[in-house]
A protein has these predicted regions:
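Conserved, structured core segments of small domains
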Residues: 1-125
Length: 125
């Protein structure tokens, strides 16, 4: 069954103290619903973009590490779920609930494996 990333985005100036107890309970309720449906595989919030590090391979083969996110934008990923869903429509239905519970914009992307990890590389040793 396909898996999907359901991400939510928060503004750079997001204040965690603005999250109410009611909002947290709505998010917890959504997580419980996802678990009961067998859809949720993983979920978490992530540190603010200002604490991110970006890594880029250089022409000399070394890796340059810099402060901050890769892209410059006013919104950054604030958390995400990994969901198993029958199709994109089912993943979008969960994402709509997430957008309501978190009160922030979101994004859905199918996770791709070439080939799927359980299938191996298909190459013999």
């Amino acid at each position: 069954m396909p898996q999907y990333l359901v991400a939510n985005y928060i503004p750079d100036d997001f204040d965690p103290s603005s999250v109410t107890e009611a909002m947290m309970e709505e998010i917890h309720a959504l997580n419980r619903e996802m678990i009961a449906a067998g859809a949720r595989k993983f979920a978490c919030g992530i540190a603010p973009a200002g604490k991110a590090k970006t890594l880029r391979k250089q022409p000399n083969g070394k890796v340059l590490i810099t402060d901050g996110p890769y892209t410059e934008t006013k919104e950054h990923m604030g958390g995400f779920w990994i969901l198993e869903a029958a199709n994109l429509d089912e993943a979008l239905a969960w994402a709509k609930k997430a957008a309501i519970a978190c009160d922030v914009p979101g994004e859905v992307r199918e996770l791709l494996f070439f080939p799927a990890p359980e299938q191996g590389s298909g190459k013999s040793k």
